[in-house]
Amino acid sequence: MLNVDGVEHEVSLDATLLEVLRGELGCTQVKDGCSPQGQCGCCTVLVDGVARVSCVTPVRRVVGRSITTAAGIDPDLSDRIVTAFEATGGSQCGFCTPGIVARLVGLARRGTPTETQVRTALGAHLCRCTGFQPIVEAALLALDPIQPLPERRNPAAAEARATLESGRPQVGGADVVLGAFRFAADSAPSGTKVAVAQSTGGYSVASTEAEAAAASGKVQGRNSTIAVRPPLPIPMVEGAVISLATSFVEPAYVEPDASWCAEGGDPASPFANAGAFGAKRTSTVSADARRLADELGEPILAIWPREEVVARGAKRPPLSLSIRADGSGRLTVATTEGSEDLAPLLDAVAEIAPGLEASIVEVPGPKVGATHRGAVVSEVLAALAARGLAPGDPATVVAPNGARATVSIDPSNGTVKVDVDAGDPICAITLRSYVIGAVHQGLGMVRSEGIAVDEMGVVQDLTIRSFGILTATQTPSVVVEVIDASGPAVACGVAVMAATMAAAWATAGHPPTWPTA
């Protein structure tokens, strides 16, 4: 017997705890972001009060023990956690949040945690949205029983700002924080057959995800020993004052591509509660779900395992550039076979840097996308802003939409200071959360993010931890000043990300390749 959130269940013993929770018991508040890698933390639950990653926990080891999901925690503590997350903007898309909540509840058993303890505990989790700091702030509020809680943010205002930033409808609240919100893989009707993507390009279909995954011949993700390297040489430009070459970067949205569809119906959107930084817009998973449902004559849930998300999904386009002091120079953007047209990116660059001679060159590699947040434009804005910057100098960027960000990094302690003008804030709490998330991604772009691609263009880094995303302990403190402007609200992401990249690059001494690590 297995006790889950206070209820006894008879379950299969030849399975992982995650397979039982989701597949047999319908506990969709436990999310699957990378199974069975055990690296994203989305499937974390409490086993006798101790946080465990359920995708790598055999059920046999926990029979007779008490399993608690985010939905089963003490109601008073649950309410404090939701209030704290809403007060700090600690959840955006929310896919990672229920697992983090479980981790934090387990941490609280040892007493009121410190910031260092919270950040260390979050080392088991990936949050691509918030940059971790709003989560840390929420934890320190919620887990200190004598700490008064601030008011929750206005739901309508928060939704409006979040939707503007993510480019897709996004909601918040208790359902998102505690996992009741249903993402695409959670919303398929009971009994829907599951199609798991194969590395050969097809799908294996079975009654359960576990059976389909086993039939797919899925190869466990791996970390490569191949170095991350830019695929393009830096262009030779006489008089250039700054040069750069970047690598393939995995967007690393935490919710894998998934969609379900009934025969003759419309497929569920893989954008359940966020925009995935624009990176899912080329995903075929919805079309695949519709095709399979029509071919098989029944509802089908199509899922890409994490390894297939990496292998099939579009990457941020690599580029190389050299720029003179007057803004003239050369820019080369890499495309690959099967990628979408990148010409619109060159048109966008021409608007912000008319002196750049830009071209597109095909190289071996995974597909790249034109719709990733600020792709190419952010890097060019960062390079223009970084000219002449010394460590600690503020970098200011005005994005094409009019958003303005000024970012400085204290060389003595790494603290990041951001002043942001995104028009009407609508909800300053939500805007601040998105600012910190953009800082996190901008720092990662310069310092650590990139994936290894072999000479044939095949991605070799297929695990969450191989993408180079900064962890909670690696992410510095971010101080945000939101300028309460009266103009129309605009998204802050490109401006903040580009200004952060410029400041981080200057702090590192303008090395010619990213990532610098």
Regions flagged by a language model, labelled:
Residues 2-3, 8-15, 28, 35, ...:
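Cofactor-binding beta-sheet edge motifs in enzyme active sites
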